[in-house]
Amino acid sequence: VRAYQRNQAAKGNGNEGSSNNGGYYFYDLNGKINHKISEKHRLYFSHYMGRDRAFLDAIDNYSYDTVVGVDTINSQLGWGNVISALRWNYMPSNKMFINTTLRYSKYDFLVAFGFNQTETTPSTTRNSNFSYAYISNIEDWSGKIDVDWMPNPDHLVKFGVGDIYHTFTPGVN
C-alpha cells in the first residue's frame, strides 16, 4: 500500500471571511495471491487499485456600498485505475500447459469546476451559478485461454483464444 496525502489551508485575499483550502492525495493498493491446488492445478489472483485527486475550494466574502457578497469556487481533478486478473494454470501432462485468464480493468478521469456568487442588497438577493464536470472512463472485461503443447522435444505448438469487451464512456455534465 502506498498512500500520500496533503491538505493546505491558506489565508484568503486579505478580506475577513475569505478562505482557500486545497490539497491532493495519491494512493495505490496492490496484492497478489497464489494458491497451489495440486501438482497440476494452480490459481493466481492479482489486483491493483490507484486513486489520485487534487482540489481547491475558495470562499471570498466581500462588501461595497450596500452590497454584501459571497463568491464560492470549487474545483477538482481526479483519476484512478482498477486492474484485476484471475488465472488458472493447468498442466494435464508434462507435454501440455494451459493458462486460462479472466481480466477486468477500469480507468476514470474527472475534471470539475463550480462557481457560485450571491450578492445581497437591502432590497434584493441575486444568485449566479456556473458548473461543469467532465467525467470519462474506459472499462474492459477480457478472457483468454493459452495452450502450449510440445508433442516431441523438437516441436512446440502454441495456440489459444481470447476476447475483450471495451466500454468507453466520455461525457460532460
Cite the ranges covered by each PLM segment.
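Periplasmic-side early beta-strands and strand-to-turn transitions of outer-membrane beta-barrels
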Residues: 1-77, 113
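Face-selective signature of the C-terminal outer-membrane beta-barrel domain
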Residues: 34-52, 77-173
